[in-house]
Structure formats: structure tokens, C-alpha cells
């Protein structure tokens, strides 16, 4: 007998099916009764069936062996387990795709789509694999398709698929099968079986069957004693005239397909409409959603739309509502269902919030295996084989903690050594073949503290050697194998020898001991998946290939998920919208209802497009057809959403966030908007934080979760939550106390006491100018850097700093090499200068830190470009050497304590009349001297890798003191530089180290007559000196004799030229008279003493400077410590304004309390 029960989406047809099946089984326990449901709800259906049987038999415990609750896949295993047939080895998808790849390569010359492709992508292969499964499921005979009726695209696809399909099926038939084989075998069994006549089958919660499932239902209904199917339609009736686009088209189509079969087979069947029950809120909502009934006032209370500030607010609304309903209204956790179109978007919100509120839940979102340490290890083994010993892969392999050497007694010590080793290799730029060298060969670079710790380096070297030796031997052995069995054996032995299996077992035991059953299952499941993948590989591989072997493992693991079991039956269920759900929930939450998520329209392309499938199916439906799964899903969106709306008996919540994690605005789904209009329900606004006392109850759950919100409200004006806070403190006193204290925290660093400052810095500060500039940039950063000596992890990379160091050292070595060889720079030929530069580079690149960087081919290229730049600058110097009387005399000249050149020293008395001192040390990139007419003249050159000028605003605020300090060092050390004579200083200048050319499109390059200027000449202007220039015409003429000429323009100093009237035109804000220079020097001393005084008195402020678009935070290493937020009242930038020379000099006189005008 065949029975079809139809009802509306709100009708509990599953309950009816279970009732009938259990009663039938109870009346005659000798015959088999099967309840077939989607695999997703098999467990809950089984629990409900046994509960009904328990009530029927009046027994608390029941045992059955003829009542079966199965999915289609389990039904296949059930029937075939005792059959006298050899069940095939089911291939994993990854193995099937690998087999397909072999076939495509073998027939590539015959194919039209893949003929000219050097490599077929895994995505294309997977699409073809799914197409092959569709062809098998649809009983399509490819040879019978008339390609003349197809367009070119479809014809090409059928041509290629026919070639590949035949070979694929032939290879399968030899020894294994794809994942759909069990369904095909089930149908073969059902077609031949004569044992179904005593069996009863009940189908529930299906709206659509796959082609093979449909075949199974047809065969069962033809042969079984009783077949009962339940379907939910729009109005609970069968509609034989349903068309695509109709609300319940998909389910009506399914019923129609079955009816058509029964009628053709002349089988009797009867239909039964589920009786209308008393009107419920869910039926009212279903009525307005399906447009079968009108508005009812009860709807506005049954449906609650929620507009949330964020996904976090959405998740908290769910948790808070569940918590309060369980606490106040006698609900159980199992009464709640949470659905989302894309549950992964809420993975980092829902789980921690529910746990914080101590709400038990079961999340049926599959946990992917690809993040397990064993899978991570396999991925990095492949990368090491393909790319060599790249540091990120080697360290990642170590960090899986699967390969711990036996001399480590615990994993904590091992992890500490791995961390230290990572610091060491990053600091020394170790990658590739450098991993094979002893760590001792790198310590001469002396870049981190570990370099000085011989014992620690030895321990780390032992760890390095263990891994590199094991991996080298493993890959050598693996790479020479050609037999698949031998290759797999090498891999397996590698894992066993390195105790990976034992490590996984220890993790399983630890999780078991702590009661985490979910976690305890993972080691066993991931190991079992690995063994299955290895078996699959052996089935399909003809010849061992390391790449293919790892590809199969990684692809297989990427598709694998951990099976899950609920830790308790009384738990909130979390699932994805569109998946079949059991009924019986009281309240349902639909979250994430945004325009991009609902409806869930699929757009992922397959091998066959919808247009291709329409052509192929035209006129062929009687013999078989290819199902357009994407089209069916898209047509079923309204119906599936209606299913979700029908799941709750008491209340439905639908919500959406107004922004995503990138702070992008989100719009509500069209479904959300329709429900808002249909139900006339008031939209509830769920904020991230309570706005006032009136909202406090919308955030209250348990003490731990509520504390933060209560504390926030306490700090708001006109709110009173003291009584609630008092209750919270009674439950979690210490935690509440800490949070409340933290809520009054102001992001203002506290000053040090003078005593503590003295312990950190001493009475005498020995520092450099650049360090003191840091104090003025942000005094808190100075404290972290030079008080606590915090440093970010050093990495030996060819970054801007390293490039700058290389520039400096190149010019330093060049100047010293010229002096050592007693050469006259002016007499050098271009060729000789080039030879000297080559000598310098070769010597530099033997230094530890540069030698290590040059192991990277890309770094070699970068060094080549750096060498081109230094050569450009050196040849520029050489071309101008005869235009000036200056000659480079000193390079990288250090000054300060115990140096030939004295540093700068400043002293003062503090408030306690105690003497304090600041000693300045440093290094000048280059000092040029000239002796002309018994006068000694000097200038300082500072190399910069980008264009820079002396900025008066920055100097006024202590952020650019370096050049003025250099000038003072020169003036104070005339005995050293001028052998006791007076030293006349021309200035201190920046030298831009660049080889860049001026853009031809630049306005600077176009003359008034629209001719283009000389490119080389204009580009060399970028190399001219720019900085602090002493406006002394007599001295300038001595230094650059060419400036004596009428209307001369300086070839050396920016913006210096002789005017028509014979006077020199000086740069407006970068030139100073000797008297003005004295003022600058005096102010510089003031700034240094002021900084020293504040440092030693312990003054600390979080006061980063802001100047135009730049701030001192831009390149700071300590932003995560500062937590600087300009939106906070207590956090403010120290804003600097641009000033001119006149304003600066006036400011200096005011600060120094001096009289007089310029």
C-alpha cells in the first residue's frame, strides 16, 4: 500500500509518521519497519521514536531490533551488509580527482577544452568529477546524445566528457568506486530483491530527492508492504499544475514525479491531507508568508524583528534571550534553535558568548579537519619538499608539537626552544640551505643577545640538526621511490619513527581526562582519515609522485570534517538555514538576515551551466536527465525560509547586523523587509552597549557576562545600577572589584618618582641626539625604548633601515679607502672610482649580516640596485669635486666619551640642588674640511635615503636637533679639526642618496617655450646639499669659487645663487647669519637640558606629535602598548605648526629670555 500524507509547513508531519511507524512496529515486532529521514536529523528522530515507543509500552527503557531510523546512505549499508557481493572500496573525492587528472593527461591531445592547457586546475577537475557523478545518477547515455542539436560550448563539453567518462568508469570497475556507488548498489539490490514485501517504509522531512534517491523510493514503493511518505506543501494539498517560480514548486514536482511512476506502473496509492489544527501563531505567520491568509494582530507578538549594531550584538541578543527565558519562564535549552544563512560568520561570536553565559549548545556546523596539527604538518612537509627549508614552513612544522625529540621531558621546554630558535633564524635571515649550517656560523653577526650565549646556541643547534637531518633523509628516501606502496611505507615509517601516533594518543588521553569528549575524538578521527587517504592513494596511483601524493592528502583533509556528538540532550541547537530541522522547538532565532545572505542564491559555476543542462535535457527526460541542483536550490528559497518560520511554536526572532567586521554598511534581507511589512511588528534595536537604565535588562544574564555592561552604565551620567552591581559583587567579588577599578582607568601614563628615574637612567644620562629627539616625539616611547629597553623582535631583512646602513657603510668605506691609499679624490678617474666602489662592496658583503641577506636571490637584485644608487651619488661627488675646495676628511666620525672628538655635555641643578648631567654622543656621516688662506672651513654631511630638509617647526619642538648639534660639535672641537685654529663652519647638510630621475611629465621639466629641460641635469638637483647654511658670502666664495661669477647658480647648495645686483640670494628658511646660528645653538642646548631634566625627574606623557599628515605613531613599534586613541579626552596629539625663520628666532628669544631684535 502506498500512502501520501500532505500538510502545511506548520503541521508536524514527522510526528504523524513516527506515530504510524511506531504503532505498526508495536503491533507486530516480527516485521521490519524503516523510518527514512535526512541524515542531518537522524539522531533526533531516533530519540523521538524511542520516546514514543517508551510511552506506548509504558516502559522507561526500550530495546528494538526491527525498528530502524536511517538515512538513505545508512539504508544502503543496512541492506548490503549481508549480501553475497564484495562491497567496493569507496574512493575519497580527492583520490577520484587524482584518478581523473591521470585520465585527462593521458587523453589531453584528444580533448577540446583542455588541449592547450599545460596544467588543468584542481577546480576544473572537481567540476568534471561532479559532472560525471551527475551523468551516472541521471542514467544518461553520453553516446546517445546528438551533438548536432547542441551549441558549440555544450558540444565541446560532451565531447570531452564522453572520452573521460568511459575511461573513468572502466578504471573504477576494476577495483574501486566513487562516493555515489552505494546508492547505485542499493538500487540494484532493491530492483532484484524479493524480501521487501513484509517491510514497511516511512519517509519524512523530504521536499526533494536526488535522482538515485528517487529511484530508491520508486522501487521501495513498488515492492514494500507499505510505503508512507509525508510532504509539506503551500496549503497542504497536491497541486498537479505547479510551475517553476511557484512557492512549493520543488516539493510539488517531487510528488508529481512519484505519482507519474505509480500511474505508469499501475500501482494503487492514496493521498491524505493532514487535518487542519487549531489556529496557532506559527500557522498565522505561515499564512501571511505564503499569502494564503491576511494579517492578524497576534503576529506582531509572535515575530520579533531585531536590528543589531553588529554581529556581536546579534549573538548577545540570542544568548541573553535564551538565558532569561530559561531562568524566568521555565524553558529548557533544547526548546531553542538558532539558524543562520552562513553560520561561519558567527563562529567567533556565538560560541564564546554562549559559553560565557554558561548555556549548553550543540553546533552542527562541521568542524573542518584542515586546521588540525597533523594536517598542518602534512601541508608544511609538502612545502618544504617543493620550496626547500623555508623558515615559515620549518617553524610551522616544529610548532605542531607532533615531532618532539625524545630528550625533551615536557612540551613547554620544547616550545620555548622553538620560540628561541625562531628568534635566532629570523634575526640572522636563515632560510633555504642556510638551515643546513650550524648556528655557530651565524653568531659573528652579533645581532641579538643569543649570539653571546654559547650554551643556548648549542641547544638550539641540536634541535635544528634533529629536524633538518630527519627531513633531509625522509625526502631523499621519498623522492627516489617509484612504487606507490614503497613511497607510502616511507611516509608511514617517518610518522611512526618520530612518534606522531603516540603523540596523538597522548592528546586523546589528556582530553578524555579533562572530560572534553569532542576534543578526545579528534586525534583518532584525523589518524583514521589519514589511513583512509593512504589506502585511496594506493588504489589509484600507478607510479609514486611526491607532489601527487601530498596533493591527495591535503585535498582529502580539506574536505574532511570531524564528526560531532552532543554532550547533553538539553542544549540549544545551532544550525544553518536551509538544512532540514526537526520540529518541536518553542523559540527560533534566524540571525544574519542581510541582503547578501538571504535569499541564499547559488552562483558557483559547475562544469555544465544551466543553459547547457537545458539543452541536454530537452526531449530526454523519459530516459534520464541531468539535474540542475543550483537551479532547484534557487527556486526553493521562499519555501525553505517558510520551513524555518514554521519551526517555532512560541516565538520567532529574525535579526540582521547593520555593519560587518570591516565596518561596511549592511542592508536587511528582502525577506526581513517583507516580514516587517506583513506582521507590522515593532523592530527592536539591539545595541552593542546599553544606552540608559531603561535598556539594562536587555543586557543582564549571569554575573560574569553582565558585569561589563553594568560597569559601563555606572560610568554614564544619570544611571543608577549600584544595587545590581552589589548583587554581582556578592557572586564574583574579586573579579567585580578588578573590573570596576579598570573601568575608571585613564589612558594616561604615570610619572616615575625621581628615585625610580635615577635607578633607570642614573644621575648622568649618556645618550645620542636622536634618542633625545624621541623624547620630544613622544616621551612615553622614550621611556619604553631607553628606560625599559623594550625592543621588537629583530629580523634580518633588507628593509629601509638595512638599506640605509648599507648606504652609510659604502660611503664610509669609500672615504676611508681613499685616505688609506693617499689618493686625491679630484685626481681619480671615473674607472678608478668604479674600481674602488667594487672593492668596497666586496668587503662589505663579507660582513655577517649582509652575507646572510645575499643568500636570497631577490636580495641580490636589491643589493645591485643599492649599488647603482651609491655609484650614482659617488660619481656626482666626483663630477663636482673641482667646483669646491672642500674634501671629505672624516667618515662615520664618532664623538663623545672616550672618543677623539669630544661630545656635548650639559649640567644643571635639580630642585634638590643635586647636579645632573647629560652627555651627548653620536656619529657624523661625513665631515668635509678646506684650508684656504690660513682659514680652516668645515661642513657636516648627513646621508638620507629620502629627500629631507631642515624643518624649523620640528626644530622648535625638539624633534630635529641633530644637525644643530653636529654644528656645535664642530665648533667645540676646533683643536681636532683645525689644529687649534678657529674653525669656520659653512653649515650642516643632508645628502639625498638616490638614483631616481625627475618625471618627464613634471611641471618642473617644462620650459616656458614648452621645451623639455635636460633630464640628467634636472635629476642631479635631487643630490644637491640641503640643510643649514651660514649666510657668509666671503666664506661661500672660498668654498665654491664659481659663485664669484655674475648671476652664478650654486652647483652644490640648493637655492643659492647670485642676483643681478651682485648679492647672494640665500634659501629663506635654511640660511642663518653667524649671530643667528649662535641663537640656534643656545636654544639647542636649552632643549637638551630641558629633556634631560624631565627624564631624570621621571616625567612621562603619552603625547605623540602631529605635524601635517605625519605623526610619531606612524612607524612606532609600541602602538599596542600605547593604546592611544585621539577620541579619548585624555589622549591628545602634540600638534606642531609650520613656522618661518622670523617666528623661530622670536620664539627662541622668548624661551631664553633674551632681549633684542634680529
UniProtKB/Swiss-Prot annotation:
<comment type="similarity">
    <text>Belongs to the helicase family. AddB/RexB type 2 subfamily.</text>
</comment>
<comment type="function">
    <text>The heterodimer acts as both an ATP-dependent DNA helicase and an ATP-dependent, dual-direction single-stranded exonuclease. Recognizes the chi site generating a DNA molecule suitable for the initiation of homologous recombination. This subunit has 5' -&gt; 3' nuclease activity but not helicase activity.</text>
</comment>
<keyword id="KW-0540">Nuclease</keyword>
<keyword id="KW-0269">Exonuclease</keyword>
<keyword id="KW-0227">DNA damage</keyword>
<dbReference type="InterPro" id="IPR027417">
    <property type="entry name" value="P-loop_NTPase"/>
</dbReference>
<comment type="subunit">
    <text>Heterodimer of AddA and RexB.</text>
</comment>
<dbReference type="Pfam" id="PF12705">
    <property type="entry name" value="PDDEXK_1"/>
</dbReference>
<keyword id="KW-0378">Hydrolase</keyword>
<keyword id="KW-0547">Nucleotide-binding</keyword>
<dbReference type="Pfam" id="PF21445">
    <property type="entry name" value="ADDB_N"/>
</dbReference>
<dbReference type="GO" id="GO:0003690">
    <property type="term" value="F:double-stranded DNA binding"/>
</dbReference>
<dbReference type="GO" id="GO:0016817">
    <property type="term" value="F:hydrolase activity, acting on acid anhydrides"/>
</dbReference>
<keyword id="KW-0067">ATP-binding</keyword>
<dbReference type="GO" id="GO:0008409">
    <property type="term" value="F:5'-3' exonuclease activity"/>
</dbReference>
<dbReference type="GO" id="GO:0005524">
    <property type="term" value="F:ATP binding"/>
</dbReference>
<dbReference type="InterPro" id="IPR038726">
    <property type="entry name" value="PDDEXK_AddAB-type"/>
</dbReference>
<keyword id="KW-0234">DNA repair</keyword>
<dbReference type="InterPro" id="IPR014141">
    <property type="entry name" value="DNA_helicase_suRexB"/>
</dbReference>
<dbReference type="InterPro" id="IPR049035">
    <property type="entry name" value="ADDB_N"/>
</dbReference>
<protein>
    <recommendedName>
        <fullName>ATP-dependent helicase/deoxyribonuclease subunit B</fullName>
        <ecNumber>3.1.-.-</ecNumber>
    </recommendedName>
</protein>
<keyword id="KW-0347">Helicase</keyword>
<dbReference type="GO" id="GO:0004386">
    <property type="term" value="F:helicase activity"/>
</dbReference>
<keyword id="KW-0238">DNA-binding</keyword>
<dbReference type="GO" id="GO:0000724">
    <property type="term" value="P:double-strand break repair via homologous recombination"/>
</dbReference>
Amino acid at each position: 500500500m502506498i500512502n501520501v500524507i500532505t500538510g502545511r509547513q506548520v503541521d508536524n508531519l514527522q510526528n504523524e509518521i513516527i506515530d504510524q511507524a511506531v504503532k505498526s512496529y508495536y503491533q507486530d515486532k516480527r516485521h521490519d519497519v524503516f523510518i527514512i529521514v535526512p541524515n542531518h536529523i537522524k539522531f533526533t528522530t531516533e530519540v523521538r521514536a524511542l520516546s514514543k515507543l517508551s510511552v506506548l509500552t509504558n516502559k522507561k527503557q526500550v530495546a528494538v531490533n526491527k525498528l530502524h531510523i536511517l538515512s538513505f546512505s545508512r539504508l544502503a549499508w543496512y541492506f548490503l551488509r549481508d549480501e553475497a557481493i564484495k562491497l567496493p572500496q569507496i574512493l575519497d573525492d580527492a583520490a577520484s580527482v587524482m584518478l581523473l587528472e591521470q585520465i585527462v593527461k593521458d587523453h589531453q591531445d584528444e580533448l577540446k577544452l583542455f588541449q592547450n592547457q599545460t596544467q588543468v586546475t584542481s577546480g576544473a577537475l572537481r567540476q568534471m568529477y561532479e559532472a560525471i557523478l551527475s551523468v551516472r545518477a541521471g542514467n544518461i547515455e553520453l553516446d546517445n546524445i546528438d551533438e548536432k542539436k547542441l551549441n558549440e560550448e555544450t558540444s565541446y563539453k560532451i565531447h570531452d566528457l564522453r572520452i573521460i567518462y568511459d575511461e573513468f568508469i572502466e578504471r573504477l570497475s576494476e577495483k574501486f568506486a566513487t562516493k555515489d556507488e552505494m546508492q547505485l548498489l542499493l538500487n540494484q539490490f532493491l530492483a532484484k530483491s524479493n524480501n521487501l514485501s513484509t517491510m514497511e517504509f516511512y519517509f519524512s522531512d523530504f521536499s526533494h530527492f536526488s535522482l538515485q534517491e528517487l529511484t530508491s523510493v520508486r522501487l521501495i514503493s513498488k515492492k514494500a508492504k507499505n510505503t508512507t511518505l509525508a510532504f509539506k506543501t503551500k496549503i497542504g494539498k497536491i497541486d498537479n499544475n505547479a510551475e517553476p517560480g511557484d512557492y512549493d514548486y520543488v516539493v510539488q514536482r517531487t510528488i508529481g514525479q512519484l505519482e507519474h511512476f505509480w500511474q505508469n506502473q499501475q500501482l494503487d496509492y492514496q493521498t491524505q491531507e493532514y487535518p487542519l489544527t487549531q489556529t496557532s501563531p506559527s500557522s498565522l505567520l505561515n499564512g501571511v508568508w505564503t499569502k494564503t491568509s491576511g494579517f492578524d494582530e497576534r503576529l506582531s507578538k509572535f515575530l520579533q524583528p531585531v536590528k543589531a549594531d553588529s554581529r556581536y550584538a546579534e549573538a548577545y541578543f540570542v544568548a541573553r534571550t535564551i538565558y532569561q527565558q530559561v531562568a524566568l519562564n521555565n524553558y529548557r535549552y533544547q526548546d531553542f534553535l538558532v539558524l543562520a544563512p552562513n553560520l561561519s560568520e558567527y563562529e567567533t561570536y556565538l560560541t564564546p558568548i554562549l559559553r560565557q553565559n554558561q548555556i549548553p549548545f550543540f553546533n552542527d556546523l562541521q568542524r573542518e579537519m584542515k586546521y588540525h596539527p597533523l594536517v598542518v604538518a602534512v601541508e608544511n612537509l609538502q612545502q618544504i619538499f617543493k620550496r626547500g627549508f623555508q623558515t615559515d614552513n620549518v617553524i610551522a612544522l616544529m610548532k605542531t608539537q607532533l615531532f618532539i625529540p625524545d630528550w625533551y621531558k615536557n612540551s613547554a621546554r620544547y616550545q620555548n626552544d622553538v620560540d628561541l630558535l625562531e628568534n635566532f633564524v629570523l634575526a640572522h635571515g636563515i632560510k633555504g640551505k642556510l638551515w643546513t649550517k650550524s648556528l655557530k656560523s651565524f653568531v659573528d653577526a652579533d645581532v641579538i643577545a643569543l649570539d653571546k650565549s654559547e650554551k643556548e646556541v648549542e641547544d638550539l643547534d641540536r634541535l635544528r640538526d634533529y629536524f633538518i637531518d630527519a627531513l633531509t633523509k625522509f625526502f631523499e628516501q621519498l623522492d627516489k621511490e617509484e612504487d606507490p606502496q614503497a613511497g607510502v611505507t616511507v611516509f608511514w615509517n617517518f610518522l611512526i619513527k618520530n612518534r606522531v601516533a603516540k603523540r596523538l594518543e597522548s592528546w586523546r588521553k589528556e582530553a578524555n581526562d579533562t572530560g572534553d569528549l569532542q576534543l578526545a575524538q579528534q586525534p583518532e578521527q584525523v589518524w583514521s582519515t589519514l589511513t583512509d587517504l593512504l589506502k585511496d592513494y594506493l588504489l589509484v596511483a600507478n607510479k609514486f609522485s611526491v607532489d601527487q601524493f601530498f596533493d591527495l592528502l591535503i585535498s582529502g583533509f580539506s574536505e574532511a570534517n570531524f564528526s560531532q556528538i552532543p554532550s547533553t540532550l538539553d542544549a540549544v541547537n545551532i544550525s544553518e538555514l536551509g538544512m532540514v530541522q526537526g520540529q518541536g522547538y518553542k523559540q527560533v532565532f534566524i540571525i544574519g538576515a542581510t541582503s547578501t545572505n538571504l535569499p541564499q542564491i547559488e552562483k558557483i559555476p559547475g562544469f555544465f551551466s544551466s543553459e547547457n543542462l537545458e539543452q541536454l535535457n530537452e526531449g530526454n527526460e523519459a530516459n534520464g536527465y541531468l539535474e540542475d541542483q543550483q537551479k532547484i536550490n534557487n527556486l526553493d528559497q521562499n519555501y525553505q525560509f517558510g520551513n524555518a518560520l514554521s519551526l517555532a511554536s512560541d516565538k520567532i526572532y529574525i535579526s540582521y547586523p547593520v555593519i560587518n567586521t570591516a565596518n561596511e554598511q549592511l542592508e536587511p534581507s528582502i525577506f526581513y523587509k517583507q516580514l516587517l511589512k506583513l506582521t507590522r511588528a515593532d523592530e527592536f534595536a539591539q545595541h552593542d552597549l546599553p544606552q540608559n537604565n531603561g535598556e539594562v535588562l536587555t543586557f543582564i544574564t549571569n554575573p560574569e557576562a553582565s558585569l561589563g555592561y553594568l560597569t559601563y552604565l555606572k560610568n554614564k551620567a544619570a544611571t543608577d545600577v549600584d544595587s545590581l552591581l552589589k548583587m554581582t559583587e556578592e557572586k564574583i567579588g574579586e573579579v567585580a572589584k578588578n573590573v570596576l577599578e579598570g573601568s575608571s582607568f585613564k589612558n594616561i601614563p604615570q610619572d616615575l618618582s625621581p628615585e625610580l628615574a635615577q635607578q633607570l637612567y642614573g644621575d648622568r644620562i649618556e645618550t645620542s641626539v636622536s634618542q633625545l629627539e624621541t623624547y620630544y616625539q613622544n616621551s612615553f616611547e622614550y621611556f619604553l625604548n631607553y628606560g625599559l629597553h623594550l625592543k621588537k623582535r629583530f629580523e634580518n631583512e633588507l628593509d629601509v633601515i638595512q638599506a640605509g646602513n648599507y648606504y652609510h657603510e659604502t660611503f664610509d668605506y669609500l672615504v676611508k679607502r681613499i685616505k688609506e691609499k693617499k689618493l686625491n679624490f679630484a685626481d681619480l678617474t671615473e674607472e678608478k672610482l668604479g674600481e674602488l666602489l667594487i672593492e668596497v662592496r666586496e668587503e662589505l658583503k663579507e660582513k655577517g649580516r649582509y652575507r646572510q641577506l645575499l643568500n636570497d636571490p631577490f636580495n641580490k637584485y636589491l643589493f645591485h640596485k643599492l649599488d647603482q644608487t651609491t655609484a650614482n651619488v659617488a660619481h656626482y661627488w666626483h663630477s663636482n669635486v673641482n667646483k669646491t675646495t672642500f674634501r671629505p676628511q672624516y667618515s662615520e666620525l664618532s664623538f663623545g666619551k672616550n672618543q677623539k672628538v669630544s661630545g656635548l655635555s650639559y649640567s644643571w641643578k635639580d630642585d634638590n640642588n643635586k647636579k645632573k648631567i647629560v652627555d651627548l654622543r653620536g656619529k657624523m656621516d661625513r665631515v668635509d674640511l678646506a684650508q684656504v688662506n690660513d682659514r680652516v672651513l668645515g661642513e657636516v654631511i648627513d646621508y638620507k635615503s629620502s629627500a629631507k630638509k631642515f624643518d624649523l617647526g620640528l626644530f622648535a619642538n625638539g624633534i630635529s636637533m641633530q644637525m644643530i648639534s653636529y654644528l656645535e660639535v664642530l665648533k667645540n672641537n676646533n683643536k681636532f679639526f683645525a689644529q687649534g685654529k678657529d674653525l669656520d663652519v659653512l653649515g650642516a647638510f643632508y645628502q639625498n642618496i638616490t638614483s631616481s630621475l625627475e618625471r618627464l611629465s613634471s611641471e618642473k621639466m617644462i620650459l616656458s617655450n614648452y621645451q623639455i629641460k635636460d633630464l640628467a641635469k634636472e635629476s642631479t638637483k635631487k643630490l644637491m646639499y640641503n640643510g643649514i647654511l651660514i649666510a657668509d658670502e666671503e666664506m661661500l666664495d672660498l668654498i665654491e669659487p664659481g659663485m664669484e661669477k655674475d648671476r652664478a647658480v650654486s652647483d652644490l647648495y640648493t637655492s643659492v645663487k647670485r642676483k643681478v645686483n651682485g648679492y647672494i640670494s640665500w634659501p629663506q628658511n635654511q640660511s642663518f647669519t653667524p649671530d643667528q646660528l649662535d641663537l640656534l645653538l643656545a636654544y639647542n642646548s636649552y632643549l637638551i637640558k630641558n629633556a634631560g631634566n624631565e627624564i631624570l625627574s621621571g616625567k612621562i606623557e603619552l603625547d605623540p606629535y602631529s605635524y601635517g599628515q605625519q605623526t610619531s605613531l606612524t612607524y612606532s613599534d609600541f602602538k599596542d602598548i600605547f593604546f592611544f586613541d585621539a577620541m579619548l579626552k585624555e589622549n591628545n596629539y602634540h600638534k606642531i605648526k609650520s613656522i618661518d625663520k622670523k617666528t623661530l628666532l622670536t620664539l627662541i628669544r622668548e624661551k631664553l629670555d633674551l632681549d633684542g631684535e634680529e
